[in-house]
Amino acid sequence: MGKFTVTLLVFLMVLPLIVLPARDEEHDEKDKRSAAQAIPRYSSKPGESLIDLMARNQKSSGNEACQDSDCDKDCGDCFCGYFKPTCSCHCLDMIPL
């Protein structure tokens, strides 16, 4: 290979390191904080089932808690959808745990 080709290859390999600005740690921390605030985090209490945790989170988000009487008789227990704005009923054996 000629001198020009080698120089061009080296330049193209080094160019992204020069052009791309380095992200500082303060900027990364700011991104992590804003991401953590955007996603609500809920922790379960000792001995609390997943269904109870989701129902409690649904109540704490301002949505009305679902009632078993709202459920279809064939469906079974009421289950508050974690990512849904309203409560809905699901068959408990269909919920992947």
Curated annotation (Swiss-Prot):
Signal peptide as annotated in the record: 1-21
Organism in which the protein naturally occurs: Terebra anilis (Auger snail)
Residue stretch(es) of the prosequence: 22-59
This protein's UniProt keywords: Disulfide bond, Secreted, Signal, Toxin
Domain of life per record: Eukaryota
Tissue specificity field: Expressed by the venom duct.
Domain notes: The cysteine framework is XXII (C-C-C-C-C-C-C-C).
Protein modification: Contains 4 disulfide bonds.
GO molecular function, one term: toxin activity
Name this protein carries in UniProt: Teretoxin Tan22.5
Keyword Metal-binding part of the UniProt annotation: no
Cellular location(s): Secreted
GO cellular component, one term: extracellular region
